[in-house]
Curated annotation (Swiss-Prot):
Specifically methylates position 2 of adenine 2503 in 23S rRNA and position 2 of adenine 37 in tRNAs. Belongs to the radical SAM superfamily. RlmN family. SUPFAM superfamilies: Radical SAM enzymes (SSF102114). It comes from Streptococcus pneumoniae (strain CGSP14). Its EC number is 2.1.1.192. It catalyses: adenosine(2503) in 23S rRNA + 2 reduced [2Fe-2S]-[ferredoxin] + 2 S-adenosyl-L-methionine = 2-methyladenosine(2503) in 23S rRNA + 5'-deoxyadenosine + L-methionine + 2 oxidized [2Fe-2S]-[ferredoxin] + S-adenosyl-L-homocysteine; adenosine(37) in tRNA + 2 reduced [2Fe-2S]-[ferredoxin] + 2 S-adenosyl-L-methionine = 2-methyladenosine(37) in tRNA + 5'-deoxyadenosine + L-methionine + 2 oxidized [2Fe-2S]-[ferredoxin] + S-adenosyl-L-homocysteine. It is found in: Cytoplasm. It is an enzyme of class 2 (transferase). Residues 97-329 form the Radical SAM core domain. The gene is rlmN. The keyword Iron-sulfur applies. This is Putative dual-specificity RNA methyltransferase RlmN. S-adenosyl-L-methionine binds at G163, E164, S195, S218, L219, H220, T296. [4Fe-4S] cluster binds at C111, C115, C118. Binds 1 [4Fe-4S] cluster. The cluster is coordinated with 3 cysteines and an exchangeable S-adenosyl-L-methionine.
Length: 361
């Protein structure tokens, strides 16, 4: 199976071109065709020699993904189901924000983190995506708009799709290098956010990388007992270890950390939990931000329900009174398979039902 050309960073593209006996500037030409002109085949690269095009075709594919189901919401949110070369399925979501187009990408097929409220973890991790498969998600979103005559450019990226990004650390870092490169997509590092469920050692590594990409942490509970009950990752990286890593990140980078907090009715959404959260953040309050997330129900996790508006507001008000910067996140795509992983999970469920029906008519 040939890799995607998108799996090369600009530096490794230059190295490959030199290995083929070509001049280094050919890498810039290929890069421009891929990321500025967004071609879908090597034959469209008209300023390259036939010999170089043949080498590209022999060693790479342009697009490793096949577009499947597309769901478009009334609010402009678009959810894509993509098929990988090995037949596995992933999801990508485009959201329209007041500041532009934001794409949420997937980094793994399935997830092993085991959050008990999340649709993404319904199917265990099968494998990591390589850099090219992550980049290709953005390229296909751009292609989707180009085919409709919509001259819109993706300018924000959130790495919050299926999987734990820091469990696929090197591929995710190369993804950042590719999309941030000023000769390519030129998406500013501060327009990119990566979210982790709390791999403390990787947070420390990330602090030392010196990149300007934003960090978000999926916290969802203010104490170990509650967090371990809804996120098994907390047993490996309890809050004390996690926050030591977060404090190291802040001290090293002087950058703000966003804390994701999903609102589960009468589970983690009480005023007492808000007070605990404020206490937990008191030493890093100036460089922390809490994102309160309304829960999207998942049929397989029917033990949870959405927090009523009054409980969300009481939680929000409590944090505000304690001086914690926070917001209730705007919802997107509530009229489609909204929770991350639902489109993929529901599609696979329907496929299994069809297979069973075919065997037992």
């Amino acid at each position: 199976m040939k890799p995607s050309i998108h799996s090369l960073t600009h530096q490794t593209m230059q190295e490959w071109v030199l290995e083929q006996g070509e001049k280094k500037f050919r890498a810039d030409q290929i890069w421009e065709w891929l990321y500025r002109k967004r071609v879908q085949s090597f034959e469209e690269m008209t300023n390259l020699s036939k010999d170089l095009i043949a080498k590209l075709n022999d060693q790479f594919v342009v697009n490793p993904l096949k577009q499947g189901i597309v769901q478009e919401s009334a609010d402009g949110t678009v959810k894509y189901l993509f098929e990988l070369p090995d037949g596995m399925l992933i999801e990508t979501v485009l959201m329209r924000q007041h500041y532009g187009l934001s794409v949420c990408v997937t980094t793994q097929v399935g997830c092993n983190i085991g959050c008990t409220f999340c649709a993404s973890g319904l199917i265990k991790k099968q494998r990591d995506l390589n850099n090219g498969e992550i980049v290709a998600q953005i390229m296909l979103v751009q292609k989707y708009f180009a085919e409709r005559g919509q001259d819109e450019r993706v300018n924000h990226i959130v790495v919050m799709g299926i999987g734990e990004p820091f469990d696929n650390y090197n591929n995710v870092l190369n993804f950042f290098r590719t999309i941030n490169d000023d000769k390519g997509m030129a998406i500013g590092a501060r327009h990119i956010t990566v979210s982790t469920s709390g791999l403390a050692h990787k947070i420390r590594n990330f602090a030392d990388e010196g990149v300007q990409v934003n960090l978000a942490v999926s916290l969802h509970a203010p104490n170990n007992e509650l967090r371990s009950s809804i996120m098994k990752i907390n047993r490996a990286f309890p809050i004390e270890k996690l926050f030591a890593a977060i404090e190291y990140y802040i001290e090293t980078t002087n950058r703000r950390v966003t804390f994701e907090y999903i609102m589960l009715n009468e589970v983690n959404d009480g005023v007492e939990q808000a007070l605990e959260l404020a206490e937990l953040l008191k030493n890093i309050k100036k460089l922390s931000y809490v994102n309160l997330i309304p829960y999207t129900p998942v049929s397989e996790h029917d033990q949870y329900s959405r927090s009523p508006k009054e409980r969300v507001l009481a939680f929000y008000d409590t944090l505000k009174k304690k001086g914690v910067n926070c917001v209730v996140r705007q919802e997107h795509g509530t009229d489609i398979d909204a929770a991350y992983g639902q489109l993929r999970s529901n599609t696979m469920k329907r496929d299994r039902q069809k297979a069973v029906a075919a065997v037992n008519p």
